[in-house]
């Protein structure tokens, strides 16, 4: 007679991200971002790009995987911080998900050690604080171009926050002895605490200030 599955295989009672951190108690306070921050229990945050060609498919990608994907990108030529193309320092991560995964995992360990809290919860707080609510767009009336303030969709708010967190981490370790994992952990902690030293949080304030002046 065959043995039950519980005796033949190890079945965990709780699935933890990267085998270390649970998402059960992670809370999203921003109601507009909540439907788009995927916190499903997942051991390995890697979907193999199965949502790439689906409309709004990114909403089904785990939030940790979306962060990993952001730090893998080198960015376009217009991504400039303090006059430098910061993300070009980390071309070794381009399309190398295993390396990017290890960087994020190490950053999460640093966050847990420094704050004593679940790093996924700290990441969610950082995203909420770094997601701008308003931006500007250009419209043309009578051959004259004007900048007007517009609301940002929740999906774009999330994208902008993650992009700026990745950019801020690259800026912090640019030409320094600080590792990318340490810089990423510091940027997430600063953004979660609404510290103006955070590039992502200060960028959000700048975007909203420009939008307010364009009303």
UniProtKB/Swiss-Prot annotation:
**Annotated Gene Ontology cellular component terms:** small ribosomal subunit
Q: Where is the signal peptide?
A: none
Q: Oligomeric state and partners?
A: Part of the 30S ribosomal subunit.
The family this protein is said to belong to? Belongs to the universal ribosomal protein uS7 family.
Q: Name a biological process GO annotation.
A: translation
Keyword Transmembrane helix part of the UniProt annotation = no
> CDD domains, alphabetically?
uS7_Eukaryote (cd14867)
Q: Which GO terms describe its molecular function?
A: rRNA binding; structural constituent of ribosome
Give the protein's biological function: One of the primary rRNA binding proteins, it binds directly to 16S rRNA where it nucleates assembly of the head domain of the 30S subunit. Is located at the subunit interface close to the decoding center.
What is the recorded name of this protein?
Small ribosomal subunit protein uS7
From which organism does this entry originate?
Answer: Pyrococcus abyssi (strain GE5 / Orsay)
InterPro entries found in the cross-reference section: Ribosomal_uS7, Ribosomal_uS7_arc, Ribosomal_uS7_dom, Ribosomal_uS7_dom_sf, Ribosomal_uS7_euk/arc
Keyword terms of this UniProt record: Ribonucleoprotein, Ribosomal protein, RNA-binding, rRNA-binding
């Amino acid at each position: 007679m065959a043995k039950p599955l519980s005796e033949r295989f190890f079945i965990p009672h709780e699935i933890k991200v990267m085998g270390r951190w649970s998402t059960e108690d992670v809370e999203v306070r921003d109601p507009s971002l909540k439907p788009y921050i995927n916190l499903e229990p997942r051991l390995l945050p890697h979907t193999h790009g199965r949502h790439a060609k689906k409309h709004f498919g990114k909403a089904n990608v785990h939030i940790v995987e979306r962060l990993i994907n952001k730090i893998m990108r080198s960015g376009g030529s217009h991504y400039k911080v303090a006059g430098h193309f910061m993300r070009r320092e980390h071309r070794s991560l381009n399309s190398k998900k295993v390396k990017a995964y290890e960087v994020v995992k190490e950053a999460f360990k640093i966050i847990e050690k420094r704050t004593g809290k679940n790093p996924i919860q700290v990441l969610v707080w950082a995203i909420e604080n770094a997601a701008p609510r308003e931006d500007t767009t250009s419209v043309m009336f009578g051959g004259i171009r004007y900048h007007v303030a517009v609301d940002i969709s929740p999906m774009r708010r999330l994208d902008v926050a993650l992009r700026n967190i990745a950019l801020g981490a690259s800026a912090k370790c640019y030409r320094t002895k600080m590792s990318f994992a340490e810089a990423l952990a510091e940027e997430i902690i600063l953004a979660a605490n609404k510290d103006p030293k955070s590039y992502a949080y200060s960028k959000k304030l700048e975007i909203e200030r420009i939008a307010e002046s364009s009303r």
